Amino acid sequence: MPIKIPTELPAFKVLSNENIFVMNDSRAKTQDIRPLKIAILNLMPKKILAENQLLRHLSNTPLQVEVKLIQTKSYVSQNTPIEHLEKFYTYFDDIKDEKFDGLIITGAPVEQMAFEDITYWNELTEIMKWSKSNVFSTLHICWGAQAGLYYHYDIQKYKLEKKISGVFSHWVNDENADLTRGLDDIFYVPHSRHTEVKKEDINKISELEILSESKEAGIFIVATKDRRKIFFMGHPEYDRNTLKEEYMRDREKGDNVDIPQNYFVDNDINSTPKFTWRGSSNIIFGNWLNYCVYQNTPYDINDISK
């Protein structure tokens, strides 16, 4: 997918070097089509890395996508240069009068805290409330998915005895579902979290359906039947080395964490991790953009409503 981003954004060079089609504003204006407007609320600490990962996955179908990066005002990232944030990010207050075809709410390393204790919780709930009338389809990832299920449906998260970390096999519950179309009977996705949501709680909500799950990692994809809200409990956007970097970070902090499962060759942390989820991740993000956003969003973006 031709993705429209500033040429100065680090992802522009990274993706161009990977032969992914990116374009600047002047090139985009020569294409007489309405681009999909996608906002990304980036709550990850390493924002540039998260940008690269998500933009890579938004670049795989033949539609033009215009991306707007959003940061919280109530909490300023400590791990991303302020110059980068000032140049490429905007605040919710600056875009709340706009409509978007899609919104991605990322994960964040705050899952062991109560939702209400998180510095930017009130701001996040305001954004999620706004998304119901101003965004056609919202994709929530990992902690963002837990936060979305809690806010919209009062579904609780539960602390695990040990952190789930690794790459796990998953199956599809409905082979005809749009979001999982094209996936193999068994496919792989990374998970990295200390908490979970329970299947029985989701099954109580008639508006929701579980589209994919795993014996080891539990629920993966939950979606509303109208596909206006999507929840990924894992991290399909992760790069080859993301789990490795998180594992090393946790060890340096003195956390008692296990080696990520099904990831390192022979569990050797000095080996190059096996990248076994790239194909399935491309399919999943492509399906969201195509079936949940492009095929159903109004041509006139101002017609988006609840």
UniProtKB/Swiss-Prot annotation:
Annotated site, Important for substrate specificity, chain positions: S192
Broad class of enzyme this protein falls into: transferase
SUPFAM superfamilies: Class I glutamine amidotransferase-like
Residues that coordinate or bind substrate: K163, S192, R249
The keyword Transferase is annotated on this UniProt entry: yes
Entry GO MF terms: homoserine O-acetyltransferase activity; homoserine O-succinyltransferase activity
Chief place where the protein resides: cytoplasm
Gene3D superfamilies in the record: 3.40.50.880
Record pathway: Amino-acid biosynthesis; L-methionine biosynthesis via de novo pathway; O-acetyl-L-homoserine from L-homoserine: step 1/1
CDD domains: GATase1_HTS
Active site per UniProt: C142, H235, E237
Catalytic activity: L-homoserine + acetyl-CoA = O-acetyl-L-homoserine + CoA
GO-annotated biological processes: L-methionine biosynthetic process from homoserine via O-succinyl-L-homoserine and cystathionine
Keywords annotated in UniProt: Acyltransferase, Amino-acid biosynthesis, Cytoplasm, Methionine biosynthesis, Transferase
Compartments in which it is found: Cytoplasm
Site features described as Important for acyl-CoA specificity, chain residue numbers: E111
E.C. numbers: 2.3.1.31
Gene Ontology terms: cellular component: cytoplasm
PANTHER family linked to this entry: HOMOSERINE O-SUCCINYLTRANSFERASE
Function: Transfers an acetyl group from acetyl-CoA to L-homoserine, forming acetyl-L-homoserine.
UniProt record similarity statement: Belongs to the MetA family.
NCBIfam families: metA
HAMAP family assigned to the protein according to its UniProt record, in alphabetical order: MetA_acyltransf
Name under which the protein is recorded: Homoserine O-acetyltransferase
Gene for this chain: metAA
